[in-house]
């Protein structure tokens, strides 16, 4: 014990001197709106911290993703197994040994890794963690839509410089739970209902996107789909059953989730969770559905990071995953964003389709040195996910053509360069759009998003046994598009073809084939004199508001069923 204390003391002296480094110097450490500090945490309280170990062969992984995702490649659709990915990226023995010894000397307990061995999660007391991570100071905070409690440090932390080649970042310190892409709008007023609908339901979705009663899962394949839940959001099985009773009468469907991965709470259902499950399972009807429930088993855990760890630890996963959460790019450290992006590369190499909501703040807005700029969202801005924007009906009470939903997130990343698969489409947009914002507001050479869109306005949801109208946001459009891709995977599997995997290279090569082009409307942005609240506007072809457009199922199936 005396030796361990001595080692910790030496480490603390080292960290306080020049032999330390900060893994995340650019991580935002301000308290997010809606959160309040409850004070310091007791020094003997236990924390669960996740150490992201430096991976190997990331460049090679990137090339493999390109090979298995490009229809023009001879390796298209020849996905890697989890074991293949682990063999490629697992940290060097030196990295694993160095970090383990460092943690053991600090008194870390119950450490466990994942199949790919690139994350290590350990338990430490607050006192041990603050000695280990010099500068960290843990407080308990309460906030979020469900008033959850988390333990975080708003102060920068440092590690011994000897660990710089071995540790990307430490999870469980700074990042608060991600925000949801969900709004509830007041119900529009309408007189008379003949020939009208009073909100988006599965039958409206199926009518608009040309899904027939026969467009459901066959029940004979190993096809599956999943959505992820955070922020202590839970769905209730009884709500799903009631939703299908009310709205699922004209198509075959499953009225229960096949598997819940993680903890499913017993509290009140969340509208977000209910929406995701109900519309993933009604768009991707009669297809086995998993729910990843990652509230964070402990106050110090990061739910989104826990979900990524689950993906790195299971060999057999659903083919399509939809996630309706995100953060502002500028609120996250470069180390964290780049590492999470690599996790998405790992998923793409395995043939998983990851869909993320584009957000509900239009182009976003923030002020840098008193100058306004648009504010992109992550993971929506990752070049290895398919990002889904939002639309509204031109006539809100009729199944008509779609226009931009003004809240639909979209824009250009300030972190990721523009991937080659979308360069031609972006150049075409920038050279032809008559309503471009000033160039100082966005990074025209960054990854542009969204890639596609779907209806995001005026949904009916059943939550806590109550039908709730006019729920809106790209949290709605994302599971709808995901369910439709699951139906296409069903046809591919029945034809002996691999699942779609990472969709973007094929999507951009086909230049919107199988999608309804949305050409009217603009989304919101900065409320200043220069742009007056207007961000980007949609137009013919791809645009950074609705991507290539919304699904026309028969045409999209025809475009994507080809080998």
Curated annotation (Swiss-Prot):
Modification after translation, per record: Activated by autocatalytic proteolytical processing upon acidification. N-glycosylation is required for processing and activity.
Pfam families: Peptidase_S8, Pro-kuma_activ
Annotated propeptide span(s): 20-195
Record's GO cellular component terms: Golgi apparatus; lysosome; melanosome; membrane raft; recycling endosome
Residues noted as binding Ca(2+) in the record, renumbered to the chain: 517-518, 539, 541, 543
Presence of the UniProt keyword Calcium in the record: yes
Cofactor(s) the protein requires to work: Ca(2+)
A GO molecular function held by the record: sulfatide binding
Name this protein carries in UniProt: Tripeptidyl-peptidase 1
């Amino acid at each position: 014990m005396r030796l361990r204390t001595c080692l910790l003391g030496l480490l603390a002296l080292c960290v306080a001197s020049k032999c330390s480094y900060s893994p995340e110097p650019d991580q935002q450490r301000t308290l997010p709106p809606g959160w309040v500090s409850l004070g310091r945490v007791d020094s003997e309280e236990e924390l669960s911290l996740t150490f992201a170990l430096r991976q190997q062969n990331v460049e090679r992984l990137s090339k493999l993703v390109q090979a298995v995702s490009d229809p023009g490649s001879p390796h298209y659709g020849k996905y890697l197994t989890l074991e293949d990915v682990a063999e490629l990226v697992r940290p060097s023995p030196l990295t694993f040994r160095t970090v383990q010894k460092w943690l053991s000397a600090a008194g870390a307990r119950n450490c466990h890794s994942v199949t790919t061995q690139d994350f290590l999660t350990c338990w430490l007391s607050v006192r041990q963690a603050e000695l280990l991570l010099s500068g960290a100071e843990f407080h308990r905070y309460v906030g979020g839509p469900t008033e959850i409690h988390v333990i975080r440090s708003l102060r920068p932390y440092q590690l011994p410089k000897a660990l710089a080649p071995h540790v990307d970042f430490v999870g469980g310190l700074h990042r608060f739970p991600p925000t949801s892409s969900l709004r509830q709008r007041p119900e529009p007023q309408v007189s008379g209902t003949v020939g009208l609908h009073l909100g988006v339901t599965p039958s409206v979705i199926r009518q608009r996107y040309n899904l027939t009663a026969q467009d459901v899962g066959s029940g004979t394949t190993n096809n599956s789909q999943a959505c992820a839940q955070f922020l202590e959001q839970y769905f209730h099985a009884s709500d799903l059953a009631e939703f299908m009773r009310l709205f699922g009468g004209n198509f075959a469907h499953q009225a229960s989730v096949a598997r819940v991965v993680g903890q499913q709470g017993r509290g009140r259902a969340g509208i977000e969770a209910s929406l995701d499950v109900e519309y993933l399972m009604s768009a991707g009807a009669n297809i086995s559905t998993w729910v990843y429930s990652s509230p964070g088993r402990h106050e110090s855990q990061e739910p989104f990071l826990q979900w990524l760890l689950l993906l790195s630890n299971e060999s057999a996963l659903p083919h399509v995953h939809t996630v309706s959460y995100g953060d502002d790019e500028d609120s996250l450290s470069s180390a964290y964003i780049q590492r999470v992006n690599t996790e998405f590369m790992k998923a793409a190499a395995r043939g998983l389709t990851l869909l993320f909501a584009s957000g509900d703040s239009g182009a976003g807005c923030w002020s840098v040195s008193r100058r306004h700029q648009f504010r992109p969202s992550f993971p929506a801005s990752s070049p290895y996910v398919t990002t889904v924007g939002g639309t509204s009906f031109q006539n809100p009470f009729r199944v008509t053509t779609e226009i931009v939903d003004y809240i639909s997130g979209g824009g250009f990343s300030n972190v990721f360069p523009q991937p080659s698969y979308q360069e031609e489409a972006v150049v075409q947009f920038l050279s032809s759009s008559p309503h471009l914002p000033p160039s100082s507001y966005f990074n025209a050479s960054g990854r542009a998003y969204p890639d596609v869109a779907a209806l995001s306005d005026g949904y009916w949801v059943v939550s806590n046994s109550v039908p709730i109208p006019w729920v809106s946001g790209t949290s709605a459009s994302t599971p709808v598009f995901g369910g439709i891709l699951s139906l296409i995977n069903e046809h591919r599997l029945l034809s002996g073809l691999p699942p779609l995997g990472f969709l973007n290279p094929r999507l951009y090569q086909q230049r919107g084939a199988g999608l309804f082009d949305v050409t009217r409307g603009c989304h919101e942005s900065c409320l200043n004199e220069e742009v007056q609240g207007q961000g980007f506007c949609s137009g013919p072809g791809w645009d950074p508001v609705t991507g290539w457009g919304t699904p026309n199922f028969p045409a999209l199936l025809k475009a994507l069923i080809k080998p």
